[in-house]
C-alpha cells in the first residue's frame, strides 16, 4: 500500500478503510499487487449527493497467481480525456489471462536455488 510495504489490500477490505488509504494518497485510481489476487473495486467517496468515484485495482500477478487460475495475467487500464471521477464507468479495467508453459517454469524453479514449493505453487495457481 502507499502506507506500508507489508499491508495487504484484500478485496473484502472494509470500504471506509480502503477509501481512507486512497484519500491519504490523494489517489482517484490506485493500482497495487502483493496479494496476487486480481480485482477491481469502485468506491464512492462523494459527499452531499455529489459523486466522486475512486478505483482500487489489484493487478494480480504476471506469473505467480494465487487465485487458483494457473495462467499468467496482466491488466489493461483505459483512461481517456472523457474519463471523470463523476462517472464510475468512464474508466475501463480489463483483466487479461494467458497460457504459458507452466511445467517448464516449474522445472526451472526446481533446478534453481529457490524452494521447490514455489514450483508446486505455480502448478496449483497458489
Residue ranges and their predicted role:
Residues 42-126:
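Acidic, His/Gly-rich catalytic cores of divalent-metal-dependent hydrolytic chemistry
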Residues 28-38, 56-60:
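Active-site neighborhood of phospho(di)ester-bond hydrolases with catalytic His/Asp-centered motifs
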Residues 1-29, 44-45:
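Conserved catalytic scaffold of divalent metal-dependent phosphoesterases
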Residues 2-4, 36-39, 63-64:
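Short, catalytically relevant binding-site loops at active-site mouths
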Amino acid at each position: 500500500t502507499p502506507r506500508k510495504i507489508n499491508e495487504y489490500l484484500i478485496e473484502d477490505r472494509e470500504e471506509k478503510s480502503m477509501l481512507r488509504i486512497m484519500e491519504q494518497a490523494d489517489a482517484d485510481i490506485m493500482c497495487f499487487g502483493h496479494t496476487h489476487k486480481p480485482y477491481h473495486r469502485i468506491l464512492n467517496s462523494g459527499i452531499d449527493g455529489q459523486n466522486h468515484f475512486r478505483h482500487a485495482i489489484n493487478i494480480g500477478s504476471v506469473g505467480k497467481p494465487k487465485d487458483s487460475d494457473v495462467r499468467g495475467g496482466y491488466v489493461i487500464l483505459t483512461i481517456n480525456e472523457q474519463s471523470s471521477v463523476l462517472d464510475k464507468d468512464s474508466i475501463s479495467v480489463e483483466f487479461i489471462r494467458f497460457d504459458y508453459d507452466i511445467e517448464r517454469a516449474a522445472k526451472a524453479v526446481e533446478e534453481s536455488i529457490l524452494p521447490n514449493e514455489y514450483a508446486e505453487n505455480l502448478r496449483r495457481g497458489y
